[in-house]
Structure formats: structure tokens, C-alpha cells
């Protein structure tokens, strides 16, 4: 039953990504992929991803999450990379940037506001990370979204 539900969820996520890709191509917009967590049996990885989703706006890092889960940073780092294909920090950054891309589609919102809403107090650093992952600046992304 859980396996069937997971397959349905993955299929829906795949369809959403396909639609995002199609829309992005039509608008010449970059697409940022964030692989869904694989069929993991590791409860710590599931819990870590859930903590990222709940606290990405805050000052969260592998140390705070490992502490919350009462496991070592080294262990969390190893299993997280194995299960997601990303380091913890890379996953967190990509998650934040996907959220930022969604927020930037509203042309009324300022880049510094988006940066703050996705957990960055330094707008320049946010912009550099955004450009590194998408190939364009947040303001250019916002302009293309119009």
C-alpha cells in the first residue's frame, strides 16, 4: 500500500516537473531540479528533509539537524548524500532556491524580500547562489517571469 502511494506521488512529481520544464522552455526560463528523496528506508533522511521543509527560512544546518535527530553529523552527512545524491547543504540551498523561484514570479515582491523569506540575510550572497544554480540573477528571473 505504501509502495503504491509512493509510486503515485513520484508520478505526480514527475508530471509537475515536466510541466515546469515545458513552461520554462516556453518562457526561456531556467529549471532547477531537486530530486525527490529516493525510496529511502532511512528514517533520519526522511526526518532531515522534513526539518528542511519546515525550517528552511531559519538558520538551519547539518549540525542543528543532526542534534535534533540525536545522531552524529558525520552519519547524517553520509546517509543524506547516499539517499538524495546531494550534500545536506546543497539540498538545503536547492530547496531554498526552488522556493525563491516560485516567489520571484510575483513581480511586486523585491529580491531582498525573497532572500529573507527563504533564509538569507545577505541579499548579495542570495543573488550569487541563485545565479550559480540558475545561470541568471534573481531580478533577471523575475523580469522573464512577466
Task: Please tell me what each predicted stretch does.
Residues 44-45, 97, 135:
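Hydrophobic alpha-helical segments
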Residues 49-50, 54, 82-121, 143-146:
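Terminal helix-turn-helix DNA-binding modules in bacterial transcription factors
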Residues 68, 117-118, 133:
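Residues within the alpha-helical elements of helix-turn-helix
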Residues 128-146:
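…primarily DNA-binding HTH/wHTH and HhH modules…
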Amino acid at each position: 500500500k505504501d509502495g503504491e502511494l509512493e509510486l503515485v506521488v513520484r508520478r505526480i512529481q514527475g508530471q509537475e516537473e515536466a510541466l515546469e520544464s515545458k513552461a520554462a522552455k516556453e518562457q526561456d526560463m531556467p529549471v532547477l531540479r531537486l530530486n525527490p528523496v529516493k525510496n529511502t528506508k532511512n528514517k533520519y533522511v526522511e526526518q532531515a528533509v522534513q526539518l528542511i521543509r519546515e525550517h528552511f527560512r531559519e538558520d538551519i544546518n547539518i549540525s542543528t539537524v543532526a542534534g535534533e535527530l540525536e545522531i552524529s553529523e558525520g552519519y547524517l552527512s553520509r546517509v543524506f548524500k547516499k539517499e538524495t545524491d546531494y550534500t545536506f547543504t546543497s539540498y538545503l540551498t536547492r530547496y531554498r532556491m526552488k522556493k525563491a523561484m516560485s516567489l520571484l514570479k510575483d513581480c511586486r515582491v523585491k529580491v531582498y524580500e525573497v532572500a529573507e523569506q527563504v533564509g538569507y540575510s545577505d541579499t548579495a550572497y542570495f543573488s550569487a547562489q541563485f545565479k550559480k544554480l540558475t545561470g541568471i540573477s534573481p531580478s533577471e528571473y523575475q523580469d522573464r517571469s512577466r
